[in-house]
């Protein structure tokens, strides 16, 4: 790639969105992804079966090669190694930045992840920006209009192809209608006053979709997707002031246990619900007790049993994995996930300076820098001649801000450092002090300004509790 012999082609905005998902929210999203995909579950009928969209995810470090060519418009055509490719931009569909592409000389249409042999997520349970179901359906329809008449084979990112024009068109039409149906029916009920949980409880997939395997909820789930549609238009809040500022789980758990007359009463009620097969109610009861007292082994064990039953009954692999991961962690504790900073390096090296500073900003411990301010000029000699060579990084009102292409003559300090070396520091391969003393970093002015910023950066939790406090 660096030698120019290979292009990395991506939709406009791809790198920005990758950074947002994998770095700014990376630690939290990565921890939650263990629940969505279940890679730490033992394989087998009582453990991990698959991920719904594919068999499994790898547990190695993440890497990223930045795109060398952005696609910016539908109808844009490139010839890659002698093969013509026509692109369709599909932003805010399965991902914020996405595209389909067509090989006109072969009649082959790739729908990326906009179509799969399963219902997809409108928002993954690991967390992400909520997807636009309406726009998603419209872009599938646009693909039918643009490419449908000339498509002889259709394939997607994860699953097997569809052969023949008629089969491909039928597949696209049903996928289009699935996302539009979820969107329209959710909002129909929302506009009658139903809240997200009520809508999820009442909507059922009609036979039109149940008759075909590729519109079943093996990955995404109607329960979760209807809530995603509601969230996109109406937020997490259901409009009831009782839910506007609810107590956190530990506080509400203790109050429910007290109201019930103690842990034994909660456990007794939970067992009755469990034996009756009322697993969702049983899980809610035991959740209050586990958060009120995570040392209560009887409560943890019963909640694990409940989660397992909920998992075994789930068609969606992500629901199953989440329930079974919760059960496993209630019995054995959550895993040691140390080394996260190093695993992020593969993505950091592809980031712009602005994106690097944005990732630093979300680590600033605001409570520690009250009343402090700082201005630091940055020069990156390995980016000489580019718009990223000079930067200003400032601390103001417990917040970091950055400005490209500017130095401030009143800055507290000016630092010259290679971008690659800054990444080494951020991933804890070395320190500012060591590199300054060895002459690899030069700093003029008040070096404590640098310490004011970088000495008050938080370290993201390598792992954190989910099913307990």
Segments predicted by a language model, with ranges:
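Active-site HxH/HxHxD metal-binding segment of metal-dependent hydrolases
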Residues: 1-67, 71-73
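Catalytic core of the metallo-beta-lactamase
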Residues: 51, 56-121, 126-134
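Alpha-helical segment of the N-proximal tetratricopeptide repeat
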Residues: 252-285
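Divalent metal-coordination and catalytic microenvironments
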Residues: 8, 71, 101, 113, ...
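Feature captures hydrophobic
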Residues: 269, 278-284, 291, 295, ...
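Divalent-metal (often Zn2+) His-rich catalytic cores of metallo-beta-lactamase-fold enzymes
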Residues: 118, 134-239, 302, 306-309
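Active-site neighborhood of phospho(di)ester-bond hydrolases with catalytic His/Asp-centered motifs
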Residues: 1, 9-12, 90, 109-112, ...
């Amino acid at each position: 790639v660096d030698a120019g012999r290979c292009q990395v082609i991506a939709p406009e905005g791809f790198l920005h969105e990758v950074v947002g998902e994998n770095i700014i929210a990376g630690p939290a999203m990565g921890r939650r992804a263990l629940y969505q995909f279940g890679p730490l579950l033992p394989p087998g009928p009582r453990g991990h079966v698959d991920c719904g969209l594919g068999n499994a995810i790898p547990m190695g470090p993440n890497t990223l090669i930045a795109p060398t060519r952005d696609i910016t418009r539908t109808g844009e055509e490139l010839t890659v190694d002698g093969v013509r490719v026509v692109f369709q931009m599909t932003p805010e569909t399965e991902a914020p930045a996405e595209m389909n592409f067509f090989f006109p000389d072969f009649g082959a249409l790739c729908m990326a992840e906009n179509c799969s042999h399963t219902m997809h997520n409108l928002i993954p349970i690991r967390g992400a920006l909520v997807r636009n179901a309406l726009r998603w359906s419209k872009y599938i329809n646009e693909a039918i209009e643009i490419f449908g008449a000339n498509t002889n084979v259709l394939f997607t990112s994860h699953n097997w192809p569809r052969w023949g024009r008629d089969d491909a068109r039928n597949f696209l039409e049903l996928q289009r209608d699935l996302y539009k149906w979820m969107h329209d029916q959710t909002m129909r009920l929302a506009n009658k006053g139903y809240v997200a949980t009520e809508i999820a409880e009442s909507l059922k997939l009609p036979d039109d979709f149940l008759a075909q395997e590729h519109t079943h909820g093996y990955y995404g789930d109607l329960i979760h997707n209807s809530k995603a549609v509601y969230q996109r238009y109406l937020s997490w809040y259901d409009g009831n002031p009782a839910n506007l500022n609810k107590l956190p789980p530990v506080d509400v758990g203790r109050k429910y246990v007290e109201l019930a007359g103690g842990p034994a009463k909660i456990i007794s009620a939970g067992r009755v619900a469990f034996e009756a097969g009322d697993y969702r109610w049983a899980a809610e009861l035991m959740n209050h007790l586990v958060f009120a007292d995570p040392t209560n082994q009887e409560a943890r064990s019963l909640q694990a049993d409940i989660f397992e039953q909920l998992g075994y009954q789930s068609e969606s692999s992500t629901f199953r994995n989440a329930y079974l991961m919760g059960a496993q962690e209630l019995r054995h504790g959550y895993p040691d996930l140390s080394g996260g900073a190093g695993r992020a390096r593969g993505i950091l090296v592809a980031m712009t300076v602005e994106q690097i500073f944005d990732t630093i900003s979300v680590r600033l411990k605001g409570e520690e820098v009250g009343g402090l301010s700082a201005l630091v000029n940055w020069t990156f000699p390995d980016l000489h001649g580019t718009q990223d060579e000079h930067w200003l990084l400032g601390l103001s009102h417990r917040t970091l801000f950055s400005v490209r292409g500017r130095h401030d003559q009143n800055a507290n300090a000016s630092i010259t450092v290679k971008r690659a070396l800054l990444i080494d520091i951020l991933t804890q391969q070395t320190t500012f002090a060591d590199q300054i003393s060895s002459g690899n970093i030069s700093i003029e002015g008040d070096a404590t300004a640098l310490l004011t910023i970088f000495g008050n950066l938080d370290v993201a939790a390598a792992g954190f509790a989910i099913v307990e406090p």
